[in-house]
Amino acid sequence: MNIKIVVLVIFAILLGSALAWHGSKHHNPTKAPTEAPHRGGGGGGGHNTPAPTQPPRQNTPAPTFQALNVWFFFWLLLLARAPLTYVHITATSSEPIKLLVPLYVYPGAAWDSVANAAKTGVKIIAIINPNSGPASSGPDSSYTTYMNKLTAAGVDMVGYVHTSYGARAVGDVNADIDTYASKYPGLKGIFLDEASASASEISYYTNVYNHIKSKSGYVNSILNPGTQPDQGYLAISSNIVIFEDAGSNLKNNYASWVKCAPSASQKSGYKYKFSGIAHSTSSGSMSGIINTMVSVLAMGLVYVTDGAAGCCTYNTLTSYLSQEASAVHALN
């Protein structure tokens, strides 16, 4: 039993006994004894059945203090339990911080590295990108082999689809989603790149979101505007990448990015709605960037790489994936 409950129970018993003793000093011992009080509904008190040889008596002090003893103990016990129940709910509703890895390279050694990192216990979501989206013909034998390998290692995969900030035809976006769903078995959702942050495009992304959710097993719908979007996007995504830039910019513009962090009361609920990707970051700065992403910006999915900005940022994995996996795993 929790020590807090034990202390409160002892306190309730002692105080209740003192109250009952105090009430007994006002009780007339020469009168006929009464039956034990019965708790009544709504009043919180009790009443006694008098001895048949005596007329009914009202306002007898002793039973009042006895009833007070019972109810005092009851409410203190409830107060003792309430905070513990809250903590229990908070603990069981938490999720692990995960790595969000842009795996834009052809299956091979890099995929092996991701599988090995997952075996250490860190949770990983890998974004696969066969051809700036799905290959219309579906995965070749190498993709099939390595997708199975990642699944066996516990990695969740999502398919890359670009949206051109809402300018790409929604039918083309949904067609890519259909191709992934029909030809790339085992995926857990879609990563929507070049996503808009404007409220004017919410209808567009609602259409896409509903299409993603119609696919069996597609639990992830990740948007990548790379900045803080309109709040309406929270309802039509599982995660939103609110930072994609050089890690030094997260540090240099720390004050401006703090505004993206939810308030303390909201942080628990929004934690898994935010994601961050930092490139051009040395191994020595990696841990500090991750800690800022998680503790300040309440991000649930993170990735830091030493890949430089440009067309080929994610054509290779970060050189310190193993250390990064350990750093993220240690946060859970």
From Swiss-Prot:
Pfam families: Spherulin4. The keyword Zinc does not apply. Keywords: Signal. InterPro entries: Spherulin4. Residues 1-22 form the signal peptide. Residues 26-60 are annotated as: Disordered. It comes from the Eukaryota. This is Spherulin-4. The lineage of its organism: Eukaryota, Amoebozoa, Evosea, Eumycetozoa, Myxogastria.
